[in-house]
């Protein structure tokens, strides 16, 4: 009988791909678990933080989503998607003023994005 081989731990890249795949398949809870492991291997990596923000948002954990998107905005104030996600998260948490402010910033940074435009119009319409 041959000794069992130990599986190599997954790399950050493999974890990110798996987590992103789970997110695309609409499994945000499983994606969040995998992406949190990935983040421990690559702390501060914007793509991982963004995917985690999306996963938490889709789970309905808007406070955690806001934390992740805020970390992205802090690291890169010109990250349009981070402002968009942060704005939507704030709105879901009942924080209208910061939500509106971040959606406006997303539109300012990327005015050609119809999703950003639509979200801002909805908020400003009341």
Question: Which functions belong to the PLM regions below?
Answer:
Residues 1-6, 100-126:
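Terminal, low-structured helical/coil segments at or just beyond the last alpha-helical repeat
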Residues 6-7, 40, 74, 108:
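Structural signature of alpha-solenoid helical repeat scaffolds
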Residues 8-41, 58:
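Alpha-helical segment of the N-proximal tetratricopeptide repeat
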Residues 12, 46-47, 80-81, 114-115:
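Helix-start (N-cap) detector for alpha-helical repeat units in TPR-like alpha-solenoids
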Residues 25-37, 59-71, 93-105:
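Structural signature of tandem alpha-helical TPR/SEL1-like repeats
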